[in-house]
Amino acid sequence: MTQKMVQDKVVVVTGAGGGIGRDMALALAAAGAKVVVNDIGTSTSGEGQDAGPAQKVVEEIKAAGGQAVANTDSVAEAVAAGRIVQCALDSFGRIDGVVNNAGILRDRFFHKMSLDEWDAVLKVHLYGSYYMSRAAANHFKEQESGTFVHMTSTSGLIGNFGQANYSAAKLGLVALSKSIAL
């Protein structure tokens, strides 16, 4: 990542308390971006809730000389997605990019999967990406620039045993990405 691309840009990274999201937040900050580190602090199975993971990443960024703030709102709710975008605006005065990385799993054989398990995964992966993108879209339009990054998976293209919910959400993200890029 070249520094000029993101220098002084404000980027929200969802699901940034660990894994790929954490690495993206750290890389963006190292390249000069101001980062909103969003994570509700649950496991991939959705258990627990803790502000610690997001705050820890913020502390790592600040220790390296970067700028970041933590946010623990859930992408699975439209109003909360609006608060995440507002956090960027309140903290840094603008928003230039959204990395939709938040995700959970509820793996189960399709014939045993409950409606709650189906909904939970779609609400975070697909609806969460929609809510975040929609919350940022008007700001991007007004400033005539902005970037969405949606994390998909080959599971969305070829399916994966025990992951009908995840696969459906990820293929939906491909279509969402193509449609809003027009």
Predicted regions and their residues:
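Active-site loop immediately N-terminal to the catalytic Tyr-X3-Lys motif
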Residues: H111, I158-N165
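Residue(s) in the substrate-gating loop at a strand-loop-helix junction
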Residues: S153
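Canonical Rossmann dinucleotide-binding motif of NAD(H)/NADP(H)-dependent dehydrogenases/reductases
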Residues: Q3-V36
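The beta1-alpha1 cofactor-binding region of Rossmann-like NAD(H)/NADP(H)-dependent oxidoreductases
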Residues: T72-Q86, L115
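Substrate-binding pocket helix/loop in short-chain dehydrogenase/reductase
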Residues: I61, F109-F110, E117-D119
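Active-site helix of classical SDR
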Residues: S133, A169, S177
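Alpha-helical segment proximal to the catalytic Tyr-Lys
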Residues: N138, L182
